Regions:
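STAS-like cytosolic regulatory interaction modules
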Residues: 1-54, 66-125
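Helical "lid/switch" subdomain of P-loop NTPase nucleotide-binding domains
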Residues: 59-60
Length: 125
């Protein structure tokens, strides 16, 4: 059985959820609930660190899009962390988002420090 974990940290005004494992039909409800919990606590600046996610299906992408929509509805910010390089020139999640044409919807950074830095520019789409 593959382990799926979501850990929570704070970096100043930013909440950071570090996700590891497979983001799929079975695990995406866990991430969805954690995002809702963060927003319910009044934290509207969120980084989803997906650098340790090695598989993502359409359910996982759906959670990412729903998270973006939720945070935008409360004037919040969502940033994703995907490694600039990884499994054959990019992470699996990066490839899936690109193949579905939704990568451009997200502000993507290489690591937590760049994601929470107000002066850092996101990686190109």
């Amino acid at each position: 059985m593959v382990t799926f974990t979501v850990t929570d940290k704070e970096h100043g005004e930013w909440a950071v959820l570090r996700v590891s494992g497979e983001l799929d039909l079975m695990t995406s409800p866990v991430l969805r609930q954690r995002v809702h919990d963060v927003v319910a606590e009044g934290r509207h600046s969120l980084v989803l660190d997906l650098s340790e996610v090695w598989f993502c299906d359409s359910s996982g992408v759906g959670v990412l899009i729903a998270s973006r929509r939720l945070l935008r509805s409360c004037q919040g910010n969502l940033r994703l962390i995907l490694p600039a390089r990884g499994a054959a020139d990019g992470s699996h999640v990066n490839k899936v988002l690109g193949a579905l044409g939704v990568r451009r919807l997200f502000e993507i950074h290489a690591d937590v420090p760049s994601a929470v830095d107000g002066n850092s520019r996101p990686l190109s789409a």
